[in-house]
Regions:
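Membrane-proximal helix-turn-helix segments that form the acceptor-binding/catalytic region
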Residues: 130-151
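Aromatic "clamp/platform" in nucleotide-sugar-dependent glycosyltransferases that forms part
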Residues: 298
Length: 391
């Protein structure tokens, strides 16, 4: 059974994390499957140790203009499916093929298109070209979801946001949580003077926030909270984050200038270090060097960093959103998303209460260990390929 996986737009961030883990878990040549995977060159070069029946097809179409990508996905890829006698198309990047000639499973994984917070709070601040492009992409996702055989989301929260905008029958909708990459992320044992993550908060508390910069990542709320946390002469809070408004790909956002200015203010700059973007090994060191993980992001489809922080045994302070609660459950303290005061209060509580930190860290470790792994995620994709969305 030949399965074509379209991940041609998986260039960075969660898209790369996703496809990398999926490819590593695809069944080998002893199975009935053969896989052809479209990937951009920079992502393809990072894939090692794949099964012999996984064939990478490198393409630069993910870097092309939207209309060229649309032509490729609707015309060029359609021709490839017919010529290669593929049995299934797995579209991993929100956009699918209209009237696909074979069975299609579509992963909707960009929550921005269906987030009321993003549509009302950020889209109107963009120029007319960006607003038109957003509406067009949202329409394409809706049309793709209506056209495919199975619609898959990583969280129930995203499916709940999708349903008011798209007519998705119950029999074709599937919530398939992402796995948790546990290798190397398990909590470190206490040895000598080396504390496990979340323990030993003393005069300096180490905070970490891992993600790529975007306007919905809500960096301003965190920076304002850092100012509040460090305004007296007591305990100091140091933030290390990869959410960098000076990142080369941040210029499209409407918030990066304000965030850069805020980060440079005297009450903020001494306590914030921008780092990365990081590869997996560097990110692991970042988690291990932290006391508390903070996650103010307003919109997520799943939140890979939350899963990684739980696997690392870190106590978490997260924005109170449906998806964050779905992923973390009782393993986090939640704050009002736009309230620096509430965020600062929750972080102060965590820093002052060792028992609470340990309880949240243990709850996160157990939750990550009990969560379905990437093998289970891939298995459900393959089941959907043959049986539909019945779970």
């Amino acid at each position: 059974m030949k399965i074509v996986i379209n991940a041609a737009s998986a260039k960075m961030g969660g898209a790369v994390t996703y496809i990398t883990n999926v490819l590593r878990c695809l069944p080998g040549p002893e199975s009935e499957y053969e896989f052809e995977v479209f990937l951009p060159p920079e992502t393809a070069s990072e894939q090692v140790g794949l099964a012999r029946n996984v064939h990478l097809l490198v393409t630069n179409i993910g870097h092309a203009s939207w209309w060229k990508r649309l032509w490729w996905e609707q015309i060029t890829l359609r021709s490839h499916l017919r010529k290669t006698a593929a049995a299934l198309l797995y579209s991993t990047g929100n956009f699918g093929m209209f009237r696909c000639p074979v069975r299609e499973v579509l992963l909707v994984c960009n929550a921005l298109y269906f987030s009321k917070v993003y549509r009302e709070g950020f889209v109107p601040r963009h120029n007319w070209r960006m607003r038109v492009a957003f509406r067009l992409r949202r329409w394409l996702v809706r049309r793709s979801a209506e056209s495919c055989d199975v619609v898959m989301t990583p969280t129930q929260a995203l499916l709940d946001d999708l349903r008011p905008a798209v007519k998705v029958d119950l029999h074709k909708a599937l919530v398939n949580p992402y796995g948790v990459a546990e290798e190397g992320f398990s909590p470190q044992p206490v040895e000598g003077a080396t504390p496990a993550p979340g323990e030993g908060c003393g005069p300096v508390v180490r905070l970490v926030y891992v993600s790529l910069y975007a306007e919905h990542k809500n960096l301003a709320t965190l920076l304002e909270a850092i100012r509040l946390l460090n305004r007296d002469g007591g305990r100091k809070f140091l933030l290390k984050t990869t959410v960098n408004p000076a990142w080369k790909d941040a210029a499209w956002t409407t918030t990066y200038r304000d965030d850069l200015a805020l980060a440079g203010q005297p009450g903020v700059a001494p306590w914030v270090e921008f780092v990365g973007p990081f590869d997996r090994a560097e990110a692991l060191r970042l988690y291990r060097g932290a006391d508390i993980f903070v996650f103010p992001s307003l919109v997520e489809s799943f939140g890979h960093p939350l899963a990684e922080a739980m696997a690392a045994g870190l106590p978490i302070a997260a924005a109170d959103t449906p998806v964050n609660r779905e992923v973390c459950g009782s393993a986090a303290e939640y704050f009002e998303p736009f309230s620096p005061e509430d965020l600062a209060s929750k972080v102060t509580r965590l820093a002052s209460d060792r028992a609470l930190r340990q309880r949240l860290g243990l709850a996160g470790s157990r939750r990550a260990a009990a969560a379905p792994g990437w093998d289970a995620h891939v298995r459900r994709v393959l089941e959907a390929a043959k049986l539909g969305a019945a779970s």
